[in-house]
Amino acid sequence: LPPCCTPPKKHCPAPACKYKPCCKS
């Protein structure tokens, strides 16, 4: 999967993003 959080974000619309440390609140 492509990086869903670059740059790091506190919220990501993609379901898989919540599993990435950079996207966790």
UniProtKB/Swiss-Prot annotation:
Sites of 4-hydroxyproline modification: P2, P3, P7, P8, P13, P15, P21
Misc note: Negative results: has no or very low potency for Kv1.1/KCNA1, Kv1.3/KCNA3, Kv1.4/KCNA4, Kv1.5/KCNA5, Kv1.6/KCNA6, Kv7.2/KCNQ2-Kv7.3/KCNQ3, and KCa1.1/KCNMA1.
Family note: Belongs to the conotoxin M superfamily.
Protein name (record): Kappa-conotoxin RIIIJ
Record-annotated disulphide pairs: C4-C17, C5-C22, C12-C23
Tissue: Expressed by the venom duct.
Species the sequence originates in: Conus radiatus
Entry keyword Iron: no
Species lineage: Eukaryota, Metazoa, Spiralia, Lophotrochozoa, Mollusca
